[in-house]
Design a protein with these regions (language model features):
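Hydrophobic beta-strand scaffold residues
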Residues: 36, 118-119, 147, 176, ...
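A short glycine-rich, hydrophobically flanked beta-strand micro-motif that places a catalytic Asp/Glu
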Residues: 37-39, 212-216, 224-225, 296-310
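Short beta-strand-to-turn element immediately C-terminal to the catalytic PLP-Schiff-base lysine
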Residues: 153, 189-194, 228-231, 308, ...
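ATP-dependent carboxylate activation and anion-phosphoryl transfer catalytic cores
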Residues: 2, 8-11, 144, 275-377
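Active-site nucleotide/adenylate-binding loops and adjacent lid/helix of ATP-dependent enzymes
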Residues: 2-8, 12-13, 19-23, 84-88, ...
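ATP-binding N-terminal substructure of ATP-dependent carboxylate-amine bond-forming enzymes
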Residues: 1-120, 124-125, 129-131, 135, ...
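Phosphate-binding site of ATP-dependent enzymes
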Residues: 193-265, 275, 279, 313-314
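Short acidic-glycine loop/turn motifs at beta-strand connectors
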Residues: 42-45, 230-233, 308-311
Length: 377
């Protein structure tokens, strides 16, 4: 039976959302195939093995037995407790359920790579690019995928100066949208209708991140989402959903606080499958596959698109490399259960790990010997 490490929580503004995703993932494994090893990382960065992940109350109290404190060793073994009585668990595969910084941004993927643990999620490069909205936009432009007009800033003064300059050419008029570069779940995202709101949004946003993305705000648009993951037989694409928002963009409250259900994107009002033309469906699918392949992605990735009803143009908004609930609900009409998806992800992670293991990472040289000889002379 394979030991599956599920990492969640973490030092991130999306800490609580991560817990909800982990609960859903852990509840969906085939217990006859896998031994699930849930590890909670608290807001101080401490790791704990969790015996009953379904109990949300314990996370509210944040009370965990020090005996369950654990550490991941370089050999891929999880050590629980201290001393001679510490428990050792050899990890076979890992699922990262950590949204936002210190998890979804590639940091955890990098750690698992160093410890030679196969993970089902995107690697360091694709994770870090997708997490940074500014880098992601630049990459999209480089591969020919359309994005909404934007500029980026690192200070309030720069934000005011850049806006004044952009306003002169008529491209950036209110309303505008301000987004922290590396946050998800719509945290810190503000629609600004005037200069005062804009300045305040920039001040608040720079308390959450060191750089901001400023976008032209569309006023007549629809949002469309599609998820993709890879298997040994090729890419699997979900049906397309159309989220329905009461505001100008889908807020954190609508995603996670609606009726207290806490199911994230699965809980929002939406049209599913989206009632769109075959041409638009094909365009969304084409771009989703292209981005997935160009960024060399792995695991489940949800792509969020925006369609401008006025200009009849489709734009990529963002890619979520660790989407809430692993976007399992988008595959239901494909007759793919969450359990089946998890099996697929593990199977592909195994193949991917073997392929990467065969890559030569080191080689012998005479550099040190020659350097040593030169010193002796």
């Amino acid at each position: 039976m394979k030991n599956i490490l599920v990492l969640f929580g973490g030092e991130t503004t999306e800490h609580d959302i991560s817990i909800l995703t982990a609960i859903q993932v852990c509840d969906s494994f085939d217990v006859l195939k896998y031994n699930v090893v849930p590890v909670y990382i608290n807001k101080n960065g401490e790791w704990f093995l969790v015996s009953d992940i379904g109990s949300v109350a314990r996370f509210l109290k944040s009370e965990f037995n020090i005996k369950n404190r654990c550490v991941l060793n370089y050999d891929g073994v999880l050590s629980v407790g201290k001393g001679l009585r510490s428990k050792k668990i050899t990890i076979d595969y890992a699922f990262i359920c950590m949204h936002g910084i210190n998890g979804e941004d590639g940091t955890m993927a990098g750690l698992l790579d160093l410890y030679h643990i196969p993970t089902v999620n995107c690697g360091v490069e694709s994770s870090s690019i997708a997490m940074n909205k500014i880098l992601f936009k630049k990459f999209m432009l480089a591969i020919g995928v359309p994005v909404i007009d934007y500029f980026d800033v690192r200070s309030v003064d720069e934000a005011i100066m850049r806006l004044n300059k952009k306003t002169k050419d008529g491209r950036f008029l209110f309303p505008l949208i301000v987004k922290p570069a590396r946050l998800g779940s719509s945290i810190g995202v503000v629609v600004c209708n005037n200069i005062d709101e804009y300045e305040k949004a920039c001040v608040d946003g720079l308390m959450l991140d060191d750089s901001l993305l400023i976008e032209r705000c569309l006023t007549n648009f629809n949002e469309y989402n599609m998820a993709v993951y890879n298997t040994e037989d090729g890419l699997v694409v979900s049906d397309i959903e159309q989220p329905l928002s009461l505001s100008k963009f889908l807020s954190f409250e609508e995603k996670y606080l609606n009726d207290g259900k806490g199911d994230g994107m699965e809980n929002i009002s939406r049209v599913f499958p989206a009632k769109i033309s075959k041409n638009l469906q094909s365009e969304i699918t084409l771009y989703a596959k292209k981005i997935y392949q160009e960024l060399n992605m792995k695991g489940v990735v949800r792509f969020d698109f925006i369609y401008d009803n006025q200009d009849k143009k489709l734009y990529i908004n963002e890619a979520n490399t660790i989407p809430g609930s692993y976007s399992n609900y988008l595959f239901r009409n494909k007759q793919i259960s969450f359990t089946h998806m998890l099996d697929d992800l593990i199977a592909y992670a195994r193949v991917d790990y073997i392929n990467k293991k065969n890559i030569i990472k080191t080689f012998d040289t005479s550099v040190l010997k020659e350097y040593s000889n030169s010193i002796k002379k």
